[in-house]
Design a protein with these regions (language model features):
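Residue-level preference for the first positions of well-ordered beta-strands
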Residues: 97-101, 145, 195
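Short, internal active-site loops enriched in acidic
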Residues: 103-108, 152-153, 202-203
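Walker A/P-loop nucleotide-binding motif
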Residues: 94-116
């Protein structure tokens, strides 16, 4: 029996990443966009065995649900400004570095734009400097970007704990805000993190 769509789906097709954890972020960054399912005519779809038709329609639904981001004029403008800020953001450690804020009504693509830019920035940094950072006695994994999802209930201590959790540090919730900040700052420095995306969602 022919199975033209049998290879479209796999057990690993679910992409339920936790972007607030290093492993989830790297999985998202390193995964290529979903491939477009092959085009079939109505007659070809109707002639498919039931299981193949189910798989094919599921693959189409997933592909359509994950289109984009689409390079609209607004998106291009955001990228240009972020590239200008990050491109000039080469101050030494004792100097204050500039930041950018994306502000708009809900549903207009702030998170989509931020994630698309951060993904491209992450890949560029890895291409430029490699996946590891040499240190005395070994090496650290290069982590160019950190992503944090915040709410109105986030405190300084919980923010620092989220940073520690992103880097997969042991006992990320133990210690004072200052202690957690020192642990997170060491990872930022040693892993050569150059961009921190803070995605604030006020659901209160």
């Amino acid at each position: 029996m022919s199975r033209p769509a049998g290879a479209v789906l796999s057990d690993r097709d679910e992409r339920d990443w936790n972007l607030s954890a290093k492993d989830g972020w790297f999985a998202m960054v390193d995964t290529e966009p979903r491939p477009r399912p092959p085009r079939r005519s109505r007659a070809e779809i109707a002639a498919m065995p039931r299981i193949d038709r189910l798989r094919y329609n599921e693959a189409r639904a997933r592909w359509h649900a994950n289109l984009g981001p689409i390079a609209t004029p607004g998106m291009d403008s955001v990228f240009e400004q972020l590239e200008e800020i990050c491109g000039s953001n080469r101050q030494d450690g004792e100097k204050v570095k500039p930041a950018a804020v994306l502000d708009a009504l809900p549903g207009l693509g702030k998170t989509t734009a931020a994630l698309a830019f951060a993904r491209a920035f992450h890949r560029e940094q890895i291409d430029l400097y490699g996946p590891t950072v040499p240190v005395e006695g070994g090496q650290w994994q290069r982590v160019p970007v950190v992503y944090l999802g915040l709410t109105s209930n986030t405190t300084i201590r919980s923010l620092n704990a989220m940073l520690c959790r992103f880097y997969a540090l042991p006992a990320p919730d133990r210690g004072t805000a200052t202690h957690l900040a020192h642990r997170a700052a060491e990872c930022v420095a040693q892993c050569k993190t150059r961009l921190v995306v803070v995605d604030f969602t006020d659901r209160g």
